[in-house]
Amino acid sequence: MAQTLSFNGRRRVRKFFGKIPEVAEMPNLIEVQKASYDQFLMVEEPKGGRPDEGLQAVFKSVFPITDFSGASMLEFVSYEFEPPKFDVDECRQRDLTYAAPLKVTLRLIVFDIDEDTGAKSIKDIKEQSVYMGDMPLMTNNGTFIVNGTERVIVSQMHRSPGVFFDHDKGKSHSSGKLLFAARVIPYRGSWLDIEFDAKDIVYARIDRRRKIPVTSLLMALGMDGEEILDTFYTKSLYKRDGEGWRIPFKPETLKGAKAITEMVDADTGEVVVEAGKKLTPRLLRQLSDKGLKALKAADDDLYGNYLAGDIVNYSTGEIYLEAGDEIDEKTLGIILANGFDEIPVLGIDHINVGAYIRNTLSADKNENRQDALFDIYRVMRPGEPPTMESAEAMFNSLFFDAERYDLSAVGRVKMNMRLDLTVEDTVRILRKDDILAVVRMLVELRDGKGEIDDIDNLGNRRVRSVGELMENQYRLGLLRMERAIKERMSSIEIDTVMPQDLINAKPAAAAVREFFGSSQLSQFMDQVNPLSEITHKRRLSALGPGGLTRERAGFEVRDVHPTHYGRICPIETPEGPNIGLINSLATFARVNKYGFIESPYRRIVDGRVTSDVLYLSAMEEAKYYVAQANAEMNADGSFVDEFVVCRHAGEVMLAPRDSMNLMDVSPKQVVSVAAALIPFLENDDANRALMGSNMQRQAVPLLRAEAPFVGTGMEPVVARDSGAAIGARRGGVVDQVDATRIVIRATEDLEAGKSGVDIYRLQKFQRSNQNTCVNQRPLVTVGDEVNRGDILADGPSTDLGDLALGRNALVAFMPWNGYNYEDSILLSERIVADDVFTSIHIEEFEVMARDTKLGPEEITRDIPNVSEEALKNLDEAGIVYIGAEVQPGDILVGKITPKGESPMTPEEKLLRAIFGEKASDVRDTSMRMPPGTYGTIVEVRVFNRHGVEKDERAMAIEREEIERLAKDRDDEQAILDRNVYGRLIEMLRGQASIAGPKGFKKGTELSNAVVSEYPRSQWWMFAVEDEKVQSELEALRGQYDESKSRLEQRFMDKVEKVQRGDEMPPGVMKMVKVFVAVKRKIQPGDKMAGRHGNKGVVSRIVPVEDMPFLEDGTHVDVVLNPLGVPSRMNVGQILETHLGWACAGMGRQIGELIDAYKANGNIEPLRKTIGDVVGDGPKAEQVQDFDDDSVLRLADQWKRGVSIATPVFDGANEADVNDMLRLAGLKDTGQSTLYDGRTGEQFDRQVTVGYIYMLKLNHLVDDKIHARSIGPYSLVTQQPLGGKAQFGGQRFGEMEVWALEAYGAAYTLQEMLTVKSDDVAGRTKVYEAIVRGDDTFEAGIPESFNVLVKEMRSLGLSVELENTKLDEAQAAQLPDAAE
């Protein structure tokens, strides 16, 4: 077969072990953030106007604003965004917020009001566009730039609005009785609770205040007692029949009861059921079929029933008995005495239907609507006397006013589902029917019908993403603004003003700023590596405003719930107090328009699994039978097994295959991105998997990234979606490449008005939020063809477009002289020498020159009392050179500050007389390197205030920046020219000309040669006969000129920005930022980890020759303790070791075949070997169709080790691992003979050796080690400060004091508690003694003792210290300490 496929070597090829084909495309991993914010902002107005959501909805809900008299009204028309002033990179550099100005068009309508009739007529309409502050924009990567730092708004999980039914689990009452309660939670507004008490009376509470009987609430809704009873109970008519009564026979109420007396048919008089017989459904059905209509009852059978209506004498209007009264001898007597022979009776039997509402009604003191309203008013506003108007207004504003109460669309949908209603989701307030339905449902629950809700079910929790959080915040800002507008409208002469004069946008802008700056959900982005960025954006937090608090959250909320399956990862959550409160979205999950998390499923039609994908939320999923993704299937999509493991209604069960409706799309849909990156996750204990997924987020990007041999296939997805690796925006040809940018001439999407050139700027040695290094390297070369989405450049922690957090290291599991005790890690010196785990960290130092009271500070090289040696790295402006090597104490930026006049010593006077003013009036406040940091200066930025003269350094930086911009412009211009003139010559070729440049003969047929005689700029002068072509030529000319001027304009704008001064904080004249790159080699004390939660600290770095070695003389790189595996149960690391060993073995074979090919030129063995490794799975590469160059490229990629992918829950099994080991020509035990590097002797047993992917974590000993002799002290206690940041001391605590006491080290102890701590006078004396060379000193009184005395005095205790001499005779009698 002809080898036709080509492979460009810019992506990593893996052998896939997965057997399950993936039907659904994995959604973009940061979709949650981007979609939510786009929906909120809606920057581009769609045709037909914006729908009512997001920002539009906020404006619509607050406007129109009318003044108090109704004489004028401010209406909202529309809003638009202007382009942002600075782009993302400029905002990062200048510490600005990346935001776009928001302009809102408002319309002010002034009315004429007729004083007599009150009729309004429009007098004047004014429309104006008003600036409403800046609205932060989201970058392409789903982050915000606030004051120059990248932040992420974490999505919040909160309880969905709607109605919830619950009980107290028998905890409230000593009898253990279940007290049921219902709660209606709106999106905003008052909560309504309806609950039972221990006596089975139903109460309502508004906003958790004092409870009132629920019947009072119903009365306030306009119902009376009889109507309430009618609503909740059925009624039957009992008729007088001779001496007894005729009762309707209702079989549904008698089910399961026992006949106490014999039951007699009222019509025939025969006994239909004997006394004591059980009434089974079958018996009741037989009685109905016989035609039994009514039963006969005696008077005493009526006792205990309740009247369903008032018993009234209609002629006199006298009420004998009221609805709800109980029937007993007395009441029955009244009824019979007044000649009533029909009684309406409530259908309460105390078994199926309880008398709760009737009892509540009889216990309720309120008789009518007014009493009920007054009662509610007193509960809500205690101490205010109610009037009917105020009580009614207050009650209506609680639940029935759209301004104050909003269920939201979600709330309404949830309520409809729970209460079986069908109300449009535009009805966002409560209705009387809703309240009645809630009470009815609650009473049914008490009667034993229905189920309570599970509040931890994901159907009852929803996600609030950026857009929604921002919407709520902006609404608050606008409401604050609304008050001010109303007041201003009333106080100002309304006829003369424009909307601009009424509006002060400060509150709205402040609300936005406050949200992004200080909300608990607006977090400093975790930017250690691309994975940590992506996980941070996909995080779901139950904390934050309107959410839970750590202390109050119980076990249930934190626990894994069956509905988490495919929606929230059960593994990835922090260890510690936040466990279970902060979660991560599962890989395939997405958030629907109501904020519920949905997971994808494949449809099953007629017992066959289709490729049709359906997204369902937890509520919808419950009714289906869902098969697992790894259920065995036949070729036609039917299930192999008769019974299939499936999930249904939150249970895992075996069910017949015919009952299946859906199937999971992929085994990894259960876990989050980080957990899906762990190979053999299925063989790890959950606790260790949790640590593994959390530690991958802390892996520092290494100097040389290397993708893992054993991956899971998720690596390219993470690298692409995180934005670390640069993907092509559209197809084209690479025109230029250097380390800082890639220029591509586009060949697709060439629309008019769009540049035909894509310039990708690469980030070079930029600092991330966590001080790790962000650096991108190009992968393409000039002339390469690229398609949309191809990887052009690798970023931090990526290798050929694959996520690469660590390095593959050769590991042996064996003890080694105790150096790997307790999870310590033993490393070979080779790892240090070859920079395997070396990383670059970039630290930023900034210094500001302020304007002080005594005069301006100055950044200069001229610093008093500093040697020339100390200034060797500074330029003439006093700023350090780029490339300078600096160490602790070196000056980075020289700065002097004026100091106040102080009395001068004679020497100073003399100096002043000789040298003039300068010597004494400034002090050195230069920026110096902090202790413990060594590095190289990689970048310096200088910022000047407007109007402050720029120094030499600032000018040089500016020139460099402008040159860079000019180069971009020139390159883009060159490509534009090449494209346009190429098209122009195509159009002119073969045309008859009618005009041309000077000296051109008319009528000549144009060809390349003819046209090329003239300079390109004159080609536009050619005119041709063909009018169609001529008009195309003119259109091309117009397009070209427009593109050219747009390019020039863009360049001028950028240059203007560079040259303009910078915005500075008040009082700052000039600011310098210095970036220092620190190279960190691995050293003892650094923390390392694998991907399976196997973490440890480097204990020693051993010379290569002392490390254990294999039979071929290869020394291992890492020695791990085998005891770290059994108790931790993370066997995944062992399988990874074996498979990595096989990969390296295969790589060695491929390397040998490459050498053979170079010798004999036969590529077929190489192609065959690679083909055998790749195999023929659903995702296998067609290596047999690769052309020769492509095979070589792939072989070159694999010669260090073959890359494989073993997806979670669908990866390599033991047999696959054995096959790979055999294929690589290795023993299938995966063990090898090792020799001791120091003695050369063979170790007793075979040792497991292989390759593990090791990470270096961001817990480096250099950042933690810290020592102090003298330093800053606390003001009050005069004790040294604590912590590395404050250059503090170590706390000598209570237990350390015990230790010294135990050793009897009295003087050491005294020194610790006085001189070394807070004895101010003593420490000065010690210093003086040391200077004198004396080593005796005396301790004084510790300052903390003085603090104690002062505290006691402030309590009013008179504490005096008396110096009394002790009598020697008395002293002799005191016990000796030594005894």
UniProtKB/Swiss-Prot annotation:
Alphabetical UniProt keywords: DNA-directed RNA polymerase, Nucleotidyltransferase, Transcription, Transferase
UniProt GO MF annotations: DNA binding; DNA-directed RNA polymerase activity; ribonucleoside binding
GO biological process: DNA-templated transcription
Enzyme Commission number(s) of this protein: 2.7.7.6
Domain of life: Bacteria
Pfam families in alphabetical order: RNA_pol_Rpb2_1, RNA_pol_Rpb2_2, RNA_pol_Rpb2_3, RNA_pol_Rpb2_45, RNA_pol_Rpb2_6, RNA_pol_Rpb2_7
Function: DNA-dependent RNA polymerase catalyzes the transcription of DNA into RNA using the four ribonucleoside triphosphates as substrates.
Protein name from the UniProt record: DNA-directed RNA polymerase subunit beta
Organism: Rhizobium leguminosarum bv. trifolii (strain WSM2304)
GN (gene name): rpoB
